[in-house]
Amino acid sequence: MKRFFVLPLIAAGYLLNAQTIGNSPYAAFGIGDVKYDNTTDISAMGGISTAYIWDFNNNFNFSNPAANKNLELTTLKIEGSNENNFFKSNNDNMSVTKHSSYLSNVTIAFPISSKVKFGMGYQPYSSKKYTVLTNEVLGSGNTQASLYRGEGTISTVQAALSYQITPEFALGLRSNFFFGNVYDINELTFSNAELINGYETKNKVKTFNFTLGTAYQKKLQKDRKLTLGATYTLGTTGLMETSYINSTYYYTDGETKNNVSIIEEKFSEDKNLIPMEFSVGAGYGKDTKWFVGTQLDYKKGETIQFLGQPFVNDNSYKVSAGGWYLPNYNNFRNYFSRVTYRYGAYYEKGNLAFNGTNINQFAITGGMSFPFENRSASRMSGIDLGIELGKRGTLDNNLIRQNFINVKIGINFADKWFNKRLYD
């Protein structure tokens, strides 16, 4: 049977009528919708992290492992995300709303010495879950039905080490281990046919790469400071196993395949699943009072097998700006003077393009960090809140516009767990 392949996103109306869509319809392609976005506080500042060194002693920066000179406490962070997506298409003026919640970050970090800091963490890296059913009446009078299904999650476990070479300059190294499975299938049938033609791709991921980081912070007059940073993430050094099967069959009991006849079967191993990334950033601020920074991220496009065919991701970049403001961390008479207020925005030229149209993204962000009231600001456990309002995609060329409101919450427990005081 000759394969009839149609990218489901091109038919926006069909996709919006889908029975199940993941957090974004664009997750149907490649390894899914990338969820990796670091911690709640960094997300609330537009994602600036490369030149971000927190002024206090209770936070570890995993995005740039070199930017951790002030960490003095053991910190345990547990964070969750709630995503609210609103999809719209000009095709019959259709709209769909989707919600999801998930555990987005678990990390622990502590100082080994005054110069060496270490952290470990878990985050989901990407995910997909979609079901798309399209029907088309052909000129012959027969009906062609295509079912697209996909699901899976890729997660990452990280270990990061920071070394302060001088009071102003530091280096860092982070190892990233990726694991998980991603599955896609396209099933095609006709009203006058007994068999279904299925094109199935399974990607098994068990791979790793490394991120190198540098950070430089110069103290200036009047408690001002200048911070510079850069990171470089190597492309994947492990392998992704991909199996592809083109076969015909029919179902019994709705799930069991019978009379399976394999037309084509392929197996491959690729090293280019996780792309090379590069980031530079700069920031300026006043000690324990305020900070503002900007950042440029670049990600190299890679090719991945999608339903038996190579799917090319374009090179992408992201421009971010943001910062924080703390009114008075020593004012214990006014609690909200000790709350940290965060703000930011970003624009991302995405790695997907359809009909010559790039799928880009823009968002504004904000958030607050609430210290536990019975702690001093220099030894601060607390709760982080973040919000992100933005848009992805476009209504042009029969595509889909995705508006989103994402809410993040995290709890940071910070204390000298391994070096308790003898007297309180």
Show where each model-derived region lies.
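Bacterial Sec-dependent N-terminal signal peptides
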Residues: 1-24, 424
